[in-house]
Amino acid sequence: MSDEEHHFESKADAGASKTYPQQAGTIRKSGHIVIKNRPCKVVEVSTSKTGKHGHAKCHFVAIDIFTGKKLEDIVPSSHNCDVPHVNRTDYQLIDISEDGFVSLLTENGNTKDDLRLPTDDTLLAQVKDGFAEGKDLVLSVMSAMGEEQICGIKDIGPK
């Protein structure tokens, strides 16, 4: 038996859950919720009173954090909803490849090469222009439910 047969690559999340349960009645505006299997930021919450047949209901209006699409859901306030683990991480921009991927420097000195340029036109222009001008840029990357996307940019001065 060689050592190679027992070697495996560890994954970043190590099997951790992508969501956690939270009672619908406790989710507030600007919190996060999973609607139709998409991570969303809540923009509006309204609750209806208990009626003759059952529970008070929460009506959520939310925006998908990656696509910007508006989604809605109605859930009994006593039921649990899935809430995504949403993380924001800052990485320094090293390079932009010709096929639309960015090369980022992680905190531990490794490079991260699996992220595409942002789809938002304003952000895309800021990244490309800043990089072309030779500025030192830090990109904010939002990750939730196995997806990642560049969502912000900071200029930390000239190189």
Swiss-Prot record:
Post-translational changes noted in the entry: Lys-52 undergoes hypusination, a unique post-translational modification that consists in the addition of a butylamino group from spermidine to lysine side chain, leading to the formation of the unusual amino acid hypusine. eIF-5As are the only known proteins to undergo this modification, which is essential for their function.
Modified residues (Hypusine): 52
Keywords (A to Z) from UniProt: Hypusine, Initiation factor, Protein biosynthesis
Residue ranges, compositional bias (Basic and acidic residues): 1-12
GO BP term (any one): positive regulation of translational elongation
Gene Ontology terms for molecular function: ribosome binding; RNA binding; translation elongation factor activity; translation initiation factor activity
SUPFAM superfamilies per the UniProt record, alphabetical: Nucleic acid-binding proteins (SSF50249), Translation proteins SH3-like domain (SSF50104)
Task of the protein: Translation factor that promotes translation elongation and termination, particularly upon ribosome stalling at specific amino acid sequence contexts. Binds between the exit (E) and peptidyl (P) site of the ribosome and promotes rescue of stalled ribosome: specifically required for efficient translation of polyproline-containing peptides as well as other motifs that stall the ribosome. Acts as a ribosome quality control (RQC) cofactor by joining the RQC complex to facilitate peptidyl transfer during CAT tailing step.
Protein name, entry field: Eukaryotic translation initiation factor 5A-5
Source organism per UniProt: Solanum tuberosum
